[in-house]
Regions:
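Structural motif
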Residues: 137-144, 385-396, 441-442, 542-560, ...
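Cysteine-centered catalytic environments shared across enzyme families
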Residues: 1-232, 240-287
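An N-terminal alpha-helical hairpin/helix-loop-helix interaction module that forms a charged
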Residues: 2, 10-13, 28, 63, ...
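Short coil/turn segments at secondary-structure boundaries
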Residues: 164-165, 415, 445-448, 462-467, ...
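Charge-dense polyanion-binding interfaces
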Residues: 125-144, 149-152, 442-475
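ATP-dependent adenylate-handling active sites, centered on carboxylate activation for C-N bond formation
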Residues: 4-7, 180, 192-390, 411-458, ...
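PAPS-dependent sulfotransferase catalytic core
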Residues: 457-551
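Short, hydrophobic/amphipathic alpha-helical patches that form generic packing surfaces
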Residues: 145-155, 394-412, 449-453, 552-571
Length: 572
């Protein structure tokens, strides 16, 4: 059984912090045991690790990464004056004359959690703090979020309500102020992206500015590292970045990798053969040897049930590494610019959002615990009402930005010696997306148009999944390639697969390890769990089916069972 009281600090370039406005001696003792530095400012106390220094008014603690004028700023650091952009992945704590100001990046990819008296980047720290004061209560309906629908919608938290009652995830468009022993959530107008239809000219104005932003981000990354890779697929999001590199004449400043196979790989090699670049893989110069069970404990310490699925990369026992820090550029976050969920079946017959539709759609799952369902649906309905937008499409895009994008493309357990960069994070690209009518935005034409700005020919080359003919959709600018799909000639021999240096090292079967844990948890849940419906015949049959298919959806049951036992044991 995982020890949920054991805290593992965040990897670089991040630090961890907790702000307490209650002057709790119990919390002070807990944080001292964790070797956090501390400082009182205006009757509030901040605890932080990694940075051992006194804090002064006007200084800012920075965690994560972002872009400066021509480089990349990496944390953890403390600075007085620094011109940073808001398009990285970070959070900051500024020591203000009246208290503290806590902010995160433009898309909120570095989540912040808070309640009436506490703020932290780590939900587990708030759990430990509340537990020390005997002020802990749980949001037991949280289990329902795991089974609300059977797809990526519920691979992470789905409401602003966390697993701890009274503790919320900070909204993407807000920041926090600590003043006079109180915590205030304030709307940040620079991050409050409203949906408002605008003209074709306005759309392309934003799009061209977004192209400049993305080029700047790419330049900053390339100027900061000589060990940079571009993850290129046959899809549309990473193609934007490849097209940008061709426009900047910097395809030779990155090494291109692709883990995709078949048709996808054929397209990627064809693009590189025609438009330039070189394939390579990171050097495997040493091994990080770990322990599956400890890695799993670290995983739950970091996410503390905010993320439901368990990616293998976070728990594997053998991880090849490069001696030099790797900068990996990917097409992450492209899904925030169109309705990602619509293509996987989450939609409504009605265009206009109605909170009653939340109840009718999300209570369909036969695997939900009916005892907790009503409370969960109330929380989900409240979350949808709070999200930006008036239509179902707009609400789902906003939900994706708040939750799926945060915990899938952000909030990462940073790999040793590697930082994943997302240059598609762009203020102007978001403005361009949100000035389009729903049906046009959801065609995903924005990535096509942006690729076209960088390299018109690349935009019209074939994709892994055929795209629509955008010349027949409004907001189109004419091209000599309209109506065409330019063929790609695969060049598979461009990829020279390197023989793994450590191929003789025995690795455990992660899926088998998960099955062992799942079986143990099912046994424990019969006597130690709060939710015995997880052991029902219906769920057991579902688990057996998932195991037979080696489906990663068993992760949902592992997390749900851990939650059930965790709730019951802490209640006792």
């Amino acid at each position: 059984m995982i020890n949920f009281d054991k805290f593992y600090k965040s990897n670089d370039p991040c630090f961890d912090f907790l702000i307490d406005v209650s002057s709790s001696k119990e919390i002070d003792q807990v944080m001292k045991k964790l070797n956090f530095s501390s400082q009182v400012h205006k009757d509030a106390k901040i605890y932080y690790n990694k940075l051992v220094l006194p804090l002064h008014v006007g200084e800012t603690l920075f965690s994560g990464y972002t872009y400066t004028k021509d480089s990349v700023l990496r944390g953890p650091i403390c600075y007085k004056e620094c011109a940073i952009l808001d398009t990285g992945e970070y959070y900051t704590v500024k020591i203000d004359r009246e208290g503290f100001i806590i902010q995160n990046d433009i898309f909120g990819r570095s989540p912040i959690y808070y309640c009436q008296s506490l703020i932290s980047n780590r939900l587990q720290l708030i759990y430990l703090a509340l537990k020390s004061r005997a002020a802990l209560d749980f949001n037991k309906s949280y289990i329902c979020s795991i089974f609300s629908v059977s797809n990526s919608f519920c691979q992470q938290m789905t409401t602003y309500d966390t697993v701890i009652k009274g503790v919320s995830k900070l909204k993407q468009r807000e920041f926090l102020i600590v003043k006079e022993n109180k915590i205030y959530a304030i709307t940040d107008t620079k991050k409050d992206f409203q949906f408002q239809e605008k003209s074709v000219d306005a759309y392309y104005y934003y799009l061209h500015r977004a192209a400049d932003e993305i080029s700047h981000s790419l330049n900053s990354i390339l100027n900061s590292s000589d060990n940079t890779f571009l993850a290129l697929t046959g899809g549309k999001d990473s193609r934007v970045l490849y097209a940008a590199l061709t426009a900047m004449d910097r395809t030779n400043d990155v090494r291109i990798i692709t883990n995709d196979i078949g048709y996808d790989r054929a397209i990627v090699t064809g693009l590189v053969a025609k438009f330039g670049g070189n394939f390579d893989f990171p050097q495997e110069e040493n091994l990080l040897l770990g322990n599956f069970n400890i890695n799993l404990e670290k995983y739950y310490s970091h996410y503390f049930f905010s993320k439901i699925n368990i990616p293998e990369v976070y728990v594997k026992d053998v991880l090849p590494m490069s001696d030099n820090t790797i900068s990996l550029i990917g097409g992450y976050c492209g899904g925030v610019y169109y309705d990602f969920y619509k293509k996987i079946g989450i939609c409504s017959d009605k265009n206009r959002f109605d909170k009653s539709d939340v109840f009718s759609f999300f209570q369909k799952s036969e695997f939900l615990n009916q005892d907790f369902l009503d409370e969960y649906l109330q929380q989900l309905s409240k979350t949808f009402q709070d999200l930006t937008g008036e239509t179902w499409s707009q609400k789902l895009i906003s939900h994706y930005l708040e939750f799926r994008n945060t915990f899938h493309f952000g909030a990462r357990i940073n790999k040793a010696n590697q930082i994943d960069f997302a240059p598609l994070v762009s203020r102007n690209l978001m403005l361009a997306s949100r000035c389009l009518p729903d049906v046009i935005r959801d065609s995903a034409r924005i990535s096509f148009d942006l690729t076209k700005i960088f390299n018109e020919e690349i935009a019209y080359c074939q994709y892994e999944i055929p795209i629509v003919d955008f010349s027949k959709i409004p907001y189109h600018k004419r091209s000599k390639y309209d109506g065409l799909v330019l063929p790609i000639v695969p060049k598979l021999d461009l990829i020279k697969n390197r023989t793994p240096l450590f191929s003789n090292i025995r690795k455990i079967d992660i899926f088998k390890e998960k099955i062992k844990i799942l079986n143990n948890l099912l046994t424990l849940n019969k006597t130690l769990g709060l939710d015995d419906s997880l052991n029902s015949e219906k769920n057991i049959k579902r688990i057996e089916y998932l195991v037979s298919k080696r489906s990663q959806n068993i992760d949902k049951y592992i997390t749900a069972l851990y939650l059930s036992i965790f709730f019951k044991c802490n209640r006792a």
